[in-house]
Regions:
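Extreme N-terminus of proteins, especially the signal/transit-peptide cleavage junction
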Residues: 1-2, 219
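ABC transporter nucleotide-binding domains
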Residues: 2-6, 11-203, 209
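Structural motif detector for alpha-helix initiation sites
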Residues: 28, 93, 213, 279-282
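Short, charged/small-residue-rich alpha-helical element at the C-terminal edge
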Residues: 222-296
Length: 296
């Protein structure tokens, strides 16, 4: 069952094209990664899904309801964490958490206290005194303490240290085990690779790749290092081998995943002494699409 469904979303801001035909589908109990650099269209897509802005073209629904016309009804079942959290400066962190949780009709004080402890947050301090990381913690505690069916997280670990990132990841997996759905927008590829069932990569307002992590890994290459007692003739002519480099009798190269089995059989004929391989990573695919664009 599709919890989120977006079809052919288009959005312009003046002459700037923010979205150009975005399709997205997130199913029940799924963690869906939405990745791309800043300015690629992630936040614009999320704002359309939340009914904050209206798409110029296309359709978006959550729980089968229209994202724009039924936004109030949808929000009763959604927890949202933005990447840049702004809080009421005269309230304490604990007061803000209580406000958000009560607005959602939840009142699980044990869950609230457990999350405050996990995220190492002092809820008695005024929000004006919080660092960016602590403001992010307030938003995360408020979201995870709510009894939502869908969690939309836009760059949620921005400002968190590695230890708190791990706590965040544990909380996300806890939610998934409860059968809830999560849309995770991020540019931290290791985080997405660790957590997500499916991924979409967005670039300049267009989805350029989408699928499960296994499906996407087949689109990129395996790194391999070998050492043989016999010289391998014409290795650069072998189908599926790329970017050969040699240093201290060690050959390193890239291998097309679909050719991996045949390549191993071929090089094994030359008295292998050493073979190391590193499987394809999401980062490899991401960088293949973005290299040359001035970074991410």
């Amino acid at each position: 069952m599709a919890v989120i469904k977006a079809s052919n979303l288009k959005k312009n801001f003046g002459k700037a094209k923010a979205l150009d035909g975005v399709d997205l589908e997130v199913n029940k109990g799924e963690i869906y990664g939405f990745i791309g650099p800043n300015g690629a269209g992630k936040t614009t897509t999320i704002r359309i899904l939340l009914g904050i802005i209206k798409a110029d073209e296309g359709y978006a629904s959550i729980f089968g309801k229209d994202a724009w016309n039924d936004a109030v009804e949808i929000h009763k079942r959604v927890a949202y964490v933005p990447g840049d959290v702004n809080l009421w400066s005269n309230l304490t962190g604990g007061e803000v958490i209580d406000l958000f949780v009560k607005l959602r009709g939840s009142n699980n004080k044990n869950r609230r206290e457990e999350l405050i402890e996990k995220f190492d947050l002092d809820p008695s301090k005024k929000c004006r005194s919080y660092s960016k990381g602590n403001r992010q913690k307030v938003a995360l505690v408020a979201a995870f303490a709510a009894e939502a069916d869908l969690y939309i997280l836009d760059e949620p670990t921005s400002g968190l240290d590695p230890l708190m990132e791990r706590v965040f990841q544990q909380c996300v997996m806890d939610i998934k085990r409860q059968g809830k759905s999560i849309l995770l927008s991020s540019h931290i590829l290791s985080e997405v690779e660790k957590l997500c069932d499916k991924v979409s990569i967005i670039r300049e307002g267009k989805i350029i790749e989408a699928g499960s992590l296994d499906e996407l890994r087949h689109l990129t290459r395996t790194s391999m290092s070998i050492k043989t007692r016999e010289e391998i003739p014409s290795l650069d002519e072998v189908k599926g081998i790329h970017d050969i480099q040699e240093k201290d009798d060690l050959l390193t190269f890239q291998v097309d995943t679909e050719e991996l089995s045949d390549i191993i059989k071929y090089i094994s004929k030359y008295d292998l002494v050493k073979l190391e391989s590193t499987g394809p990573k999401l980062e490899d695919l991401f960088m293949r699409h973005y290299e040359g664009d001035g970074g991410v």
